């Protein structure tokens, strides 16, 4: 599952090497593709996935992968326990719950970027610099879907920044792989939060890496990491 307000087709281009090793399915969140309905909630997205998997694959998947908000959505899917998933890779998961104020600020930033054709507002570059982040640490912005409606953007961001861990994930038998970079404070905080509930997980933190850095800058190695992880999971 792709990241927050991102174009699923751009994610597919990065992940194409996986098509050679696995039978892959690329869901797209509502509000993030041409002709789609507006985004409503993570629960609504999960229900659509559950209906598809139940109707086409008997309610079972060998594995799921999600990056950033996609990882958060996958955690909700696992917590609902309506389909069986053997393994889940959650990369850069976001469960920090910064609140509505952060959603409102992000909405204004995204709106300005949409109006400017995806260019970073000057004040955002300053904030990133103060945080020690360069533009290459924000690779996910290059994959955003800039035709999302204002309603989808606002609702999606509010869901993202107010979501909390669903305690139902404690009942999941899925083997969970938590991945993030060493320069991702919110993802690492999210790891600490979700590990309180998981009964079967492995954690990998890549030193010196920012949000999405492995996927966007070291794509070939990242693809190999996914393949090795999922093939190893089959042997468990």
PLM regions and their residue ranges:
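Conserved HGGG/HGGXW glycine-rich cap/lid loop of the alpha/beta-hydrolase fold
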Residues: 1-34
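Gly/Ala-rich beta-loop-alpha elbow adjacent to hydrolase catalytic centers
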Residues: 65-74
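Flexible "cap/lid" loop of the alpha/beta hydrolase fold
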Residues: 79-80, 85-116
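Short beta-strand/loop motif that positions the catalytic acidic residue
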Residues: 172, 178-180
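Active-site loop/oxyanion-hole signature of alpha/beta-hydrolase fold enzymes
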Residues: 25-63
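Acidic catalytic loop of the alpha/beta-hydrolase fold
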Residues: 182-187
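Conserved alpha/beta-hydrolase catalytic His-Asp/Glu region
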Residues: 99-101, 117-170
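Catalytic histidine-centered segment of alpha/beta-hydrolase-like enzymes
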Residues: 209-221
């Amino acid at each position: 599952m792709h990241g927050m307000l991102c174009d699923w087709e751009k994610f597919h281009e990065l992940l194409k090497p996986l098509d050679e090793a696995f039978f892959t399915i690329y869901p797209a969140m509502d509000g993030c593709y041409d002709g789609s309905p507006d985004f409503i909630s993570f629960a609504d997205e999960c229900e659509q996935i559950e209906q598809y998997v139940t109707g086409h694959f008997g309610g079972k998947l060998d594995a799921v992968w999600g990056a950033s908000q996609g990882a958060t959505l996958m955690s909700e899917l696992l917590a609902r326990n309506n389909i069986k998933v053997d393994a889940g890779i959650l990369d850069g998961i976001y469960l920090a719950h910064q609140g509505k104020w952060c959603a409102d600020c992000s909405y204004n930033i995204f709106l300005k970027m949409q109006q400017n054709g995806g260019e970073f507002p000057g004040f955002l570059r300053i904030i990133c610099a103060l945080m020690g982040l360069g533009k290459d640490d924000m690779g996910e912005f290059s994959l955003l879907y800039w035709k999302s409606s204002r309603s989808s953007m606002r609702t999606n961001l509010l869901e993202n920044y107010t979501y909390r861990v669903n305690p139902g994930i404690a009942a999941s038998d899925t083997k969970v792989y938590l991945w993030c970079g060493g320069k991702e404070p919110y993802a690492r905080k999210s790891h600490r939060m979700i590990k309180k509930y998981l009964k079967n997980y492995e954690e990998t933190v890549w030193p010196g890496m920012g949000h999405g850095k492995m996927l966007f800058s070291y794509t070939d190695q990242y693809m190999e990491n996914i393949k090795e992880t999922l093939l190893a999971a089959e042997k468990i």
